[in-house]
Amino acid sequence: MVNLPRDRMDQVVKRFEMLEAQMSAGPAPDAYVKMASEYAELQDMVAKVRQLRSAEHEQADLEAMLADKGTDAEMRALAEADLPDVEERIEALQKDIQILLLPKDAADDKNAILEIRAGTGGDEAALFAGDLFRMYERYAAERGWRFETVSASDGDAGGFKEIIATVSGKGVFAHLKFESGVHRVQRVPATEASGRIHTSAATVAVLPEAEEVDIEIRAEDIRIDTMRASGSGGQHVNTTDSAVRITHLPTGIMVVQAEKSQHQNRAKAMQILRARLYDLERSKADEERSESRKSQVGSGDRSERIRTYNFPQGRVTDHRINLTLYKLDRVMMGELDEIVDALIADHQSKLLADIGLDG
């Protein structure tokens, strides 16, 4: 039997019913929008709690029927057949409610900025960075998310030295946040005549996209420089001074955008700067909450090797949860759900243990 905080569940249902009544009374538009947002957040939890209560009543009735010596044989047989199904349903609902009761990461519903950089391994690392980029692009397409390249620095032999994209849609950061870290590849490069396996790496950073309300950037804290865009590898060369470099003076964080429109460059550079500053704030808060930091999948450190992609064996291994899948080709085609779901489940189970709800 799972240990659930019944008082808290009752409070959630009461709050939901109160909001329902207030919204029916026709409040002012601003108040209605706020209420509707909270109402939507509570809806899943309340539905599960009501289903659980109904199933528990059903269980009690069946147990009473079985305990009653006056119950005829046919009814007893029906009750005995139904009871295991009801108990199974109750257990599943309890687990669902446990997850819904977990502390919510405020950034989970946000869009994300995805940054991929080639690491050790030269040209092969840049090619792998390109492979990872396409993997995430396909994953985003599978989930119906919008995926847009913000900037790219091409590798000398293909792929990317660095590429940045925005990913927009429902649950983007919640699903991508565990991708941050070092991704290692083991394969035979196309240029390797002897067939020797090379190891190279790329670093992935997933940042929650920050709104202006999330992070304040004061005008006096930034320096904006414009410069001539030279393009990468001779591409996108622009003879006007359109490239923009924004430096955040207090932290030294620098963002450069070098597409053709100076106005767009400034807006995109500010978008990335805001995300990096917001991420910095979140990291500091995580460090202060050292106990909760232990519950994260891995350390969250972007220098931590999190996953290995072994092409000769067709294997992908996530080292944080010791998960190995022998379907590398499908993973590279964007089939990431099995890995992502396992990472989320592992994170949730550790959170449940932390707050004493692991039953």
Curated annotation (Swiss-Prot):
Compartment list: Cytoplasm
PTM info: Methylated by PrmC. Methylation increases the termination efficiency of RF1.
One function term, GO molecular function aspect: translation release factor activity, codon specific
N5-methylglutamine PTM sites in chain numbering: Q235
SUPFAM superfamilies for this protein: Release factor (SSF75620)
Gene Ontology CC: cytoplasm
Annotated region (Disordered), positions in chain: 283-309
Comp. bias intervals (Basic and acidic residues): 283-294
SMART domains in the record: PCRF
Keywords noted in UniProt: Cytoplasm, Methylation, Protein biosynthesis
Family according to the record: Belongs to the prokaryotic/mitochondrial release factor family.
Family annotation (HAMAP family): Rel_fac_1 (MF_00093)
General function of this protein: Peptide chain release factor 1 directs the termination of translation in response to the peptide chain termination codons UAG and UAA.
Protein name, per record: Peptide chain release factor 1
